């Protein structure tokens, strides 16, 4: 395994928050940090007429998150236990295929903008939950996940050279606390896919050897081969900015897509969607397969027709792959509406849509 890259990118471990530098090219990039290349006056006028779409699935997820967070803040531990048990038993999904049990735990996470006292207050609730339910796998996983998030909060997002010894010590200490909770709860009779989710995040932060990380991934997918977050986490760890070499994550994505009992091409597409912000021109700068991605997108659209995000992602990725016909099909479905979570800049949406319709870049 490659040495850790100076811990300079630790802040992006949990979610894909930043994009690559935009490159001047005649093909699309997923980055929205700069201006939109080659846009003309007509496209700017078209962009001004666009409407922000509201994804009903995202609304559903937000409502679920708010309710679970309210239960946590009100210390309704019995209700939390009942909800988590039901989500595990039913393997319930939102209408975009995301797992409700994962969002259950995400609901308790604090924001980086919140003061330290808010984190300490949350820690106290977690401890009360464990005291009230000492044999609960749910309470243990929630606390471990809290420690992982608290570690990144304490450390900050700067380069290693900007992190004080005290901050780095606190970071390592909290990751170790997360690992201790995970070890303690590992043999609990009830299992939860989020246990491996948190364990993999901890392992990445601690820089586990490849063989240990791979063993953990194998355990995770053996327990629940359709819990797509595990395969995404492994692919993410194989980015060149982490522990991989060029082509590593792409090879893993194909392996995950071919796994018996898994999600097939859908898994490949989910990995590409998750990593696109890190790879600039996805289908020019990497070995990612557009045919396999497109196959997965088609599966996602068939299974989850209510998700506007999937259509927006398909439109964006088709443009990046210069598949004009498929891009046009997706943009035609979207009309004059766009999802800001996929297209932060309406000008980019208008520019890409115009290319799909006319072939003019």
Model-derived regions: residue spans:
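Bacterial signal peptide processing site
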Residues: 20-23
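N-terminal mature-domain "stem" immediately C-terminal to a signal peptide or N-terminal signal-anchor/transmembrane
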Residues: 28-94
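Active-site cores of enzymes that catalyze phosphoryl transfer or operate on phosphate-rich substrates
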Residues: 138-142, 150, 315
């Amino acid at each position: 395994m490659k040495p850790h890259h100076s811990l300079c990118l630790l802040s992006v471990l949990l979610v894909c928050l930043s994009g690559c530098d935009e490159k001047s090219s005649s093909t699309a990039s997923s980055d929205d940090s700069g201006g939109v290349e080659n846009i003309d006056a007509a496209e700017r006028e078209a962009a001004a007429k666009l409407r922000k779409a509201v994804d009903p699935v995202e609304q559903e997820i937000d409502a679920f998150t708010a309710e679970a967070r309210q239960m946590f803040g009100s210390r309704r531990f019995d209700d939390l236990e009942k909800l988590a048990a039901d989500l595990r038993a039913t393997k319930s999904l939102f209408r975009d295929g995301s797992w409700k049990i994962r969002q259950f735990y995400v609901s308790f996470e604090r924001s980086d903008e919140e003061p330290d006292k808010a984190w300490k207050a949350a820690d106290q609730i977690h401890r009360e939950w464990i005291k009230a339910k000492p044999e609960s796998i749910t309470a243990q996983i929630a606390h471990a996940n809290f420690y992982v998030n608290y570690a990144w909060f304490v450390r900050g997002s700067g380069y290693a050279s900007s992190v004080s010894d005290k901050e780095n010590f606190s970071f390592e200490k909290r990751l170790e606390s997360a690992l201790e909770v995970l070890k303690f709860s590992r043999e609990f009779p009830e299992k939860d896919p989020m246990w491996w989710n948190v364990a993999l995040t901890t392992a990445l932060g601690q820089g586990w050897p490849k063989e240990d990380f791979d063993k953990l991934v194998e355990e995770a997918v053996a327990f629940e081969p359709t819990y797509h977050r595990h395969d995404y986490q492994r692919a993410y760890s194989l980015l060149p900015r982490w522990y991989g070499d060029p082509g590593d994550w792409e090879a893993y994505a194909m392996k995950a897509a071919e796994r018996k009992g898994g999600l097939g091409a859908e898994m490949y597409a989910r990995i590409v969607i998750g990593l696109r912000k890190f790879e600039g021109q996805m289908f020019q700068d990497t070995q990612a397969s557009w045919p396999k991605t497109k196959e997965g997108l088609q599966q996602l659209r068939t299974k989850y027709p209510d998700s506007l995000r999937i259509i927006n992602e398909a439109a964006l990725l088709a443009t990046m792959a210069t598949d004009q016909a498929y891009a046009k099909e997706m943009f035609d479905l979207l009309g004059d509406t766009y999802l800001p979570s996929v297209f932060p800049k309406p000008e980019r949406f208008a520019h890409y849509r115009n290319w799909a319709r006319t072939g003019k870049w």
